[in-house]
A protein has these predicted regions:
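Rossmann-fold dehydrogenase core element
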Residues: 250-252, 263-303
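C-terminal hydrophobic helical "lid"/dimerization subdomain
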Residues: 1-4, 239, 283-334
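NAD(P)H dinucleotide-binding glycine-rich loop of Rossmann-like/cofactor-binding domains
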Residues: 81-168
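N-terminal Rossmann-fold NAD(P) dinucleotide-binding loop
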Residues: 174-175
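Adenosine-nucleotide cofactor-binding segment
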Residues: 161-170, 180-240
């Protein structure tokens, strides 16, 4: 076994601190990867602070992993049952027995998984991804979560040229959603509660910007969109945005508010609208997304930080003070 340097949360109320542990020896189908960059996802904060009720401590977060060597990536999971219908269909994220998370998971031998806030990782080759050398290195890691989280549902609902797509919320997920929807040929509108986001939305490629607090603007957008990709994790009123959908329109939910949301039946029934959720993507689709990004030169907008800045980064994420994703340079941990 090899000693790995990392940062870990020892409990839900403690900051992340240096932590050493042993990675398993590579098996016949494993690859040992030296981690170059790891993205910081908002879900890392939820898990490290025990907010979802399933945290395993000590915890080494990080599921947006980009490595040196053959330019390899590791995303949100490192194993699944491989036998159920979903796994066989390339939907490992919906594995009937549960995917094995890159961190805060349990391997088949009962050992906990530790993530990418570390210098290296050992992963089954079936759960690694190829990354093109055409892409700027620092912006790749967030594609493995924020990227696939937005790419997958847009592909699932068949977004195409000429569709009217709204992206609700301009953050780590929202900025990737704009890039993908534009690349698919859609007419894209950014819906935001912050006037300061207009310039960034336009820079990212959005064709329109709508301030959600402007009643006249929102009224004018009723029955307008084919798809709304809802990336907002703060508590908000879904019904307001359902009314912006055309007949047969779909709201895709990828943000997770802290409390249950209220849905009335009439906005759905009267225009045959629908709401769906979506969780990351399978290995095949994630590879497809990475190849698409290489073809269209799509990466995440990032701020690169050192490992010892992680606790400050968490606080800044909670204040929406990052444009639009933190990425840890793991060279700072060696």
């Amino acid at each position: 076994m090899s000693i790995t340097k990392a940062y870990a949360a020892q409990g839900a109320t403690t900051p992340l601190t240096p932590f050493n542990f042993e990675r398993r020896e590579p098996g016949a189908h494993d690859v040992q990867i030296e981690i170059l960059y790891c993205g910081v996802c908002h879900s890392d904060i939820h898990q490290a602070r025990g907010e979802w009720g399933n945290s395993i401590f000590p915890m080494v977060p990080g599921h947006e992993i980009f490595a040196v060597g053959d330019l390899a990536g590791v995303g949100c999971f490192v194993d699944s049952c491989r036998e159920c219908h979903n796994c066989k269909e390339g939907l490992e994220q919906y594995c009937d027995t549960g995917m094995v998370g890159t961190y805060n998971g349990v391997e088949k031998d009962g050992t906990p998984t530790y993530g990418g806030y570390s210098t290296q990782i050992v992963v089954d080759e079936k759960y690694t991804l190829r990354v093109s050398d055409k892409l700027p290195l620092t912006g790749v890691a967030p594609l493995l979560c924020a990227g696939i989280t937005t790419y997958s549902p847009l592909k699932h609902v068949g977004v195409k040229k000429g569709d009217r797509v709204a992206v609700l919320g301009l953050g780590g997920l929202g900025h990737m959603a704009v890039k993908f929807a534009v690349a698919f040929g859609a007419e894209v509108t950014m819906l935001s509660s912050s006037p300061s986001k207009k310039a960034d939305a336009e820079r990212l490629g959005a064709h329109h910007f709508a301030l959600t607090s402007d009643e006249a603007t929102m009224k004018g957008l009723q029955n307008h969109f084919d798809v709304i990709l809802n990336t907002v994790s703060a508590q908000h009123d879904y019904i307001t945005y359902l009314n912006l959908l055309r007949t047969n329109g779909t709201m895709i939910v990828v943000g997770v508010p802290p409390a249950p949301v209220q849905i009335h039946a009439f906005p759905l029934i009267m225009q045959r609208r629908s709401i769906i959720g979506s969780l990351i993507g399978g290995i095949k689709e994630t590879q497809e997304m990475l190849d698409f990004c290489a073809e269209h030169n799509i990466v995440s907008d990032v701020e690169v930080i050192k490992m010892d800045y992680i606790n400050e980064a968490y606080e800044r994420i909670l204040k929406s003070d990052v444009r639009y994703r933190f990425v840890i340079d793991l060279a700072s941990l060696k």
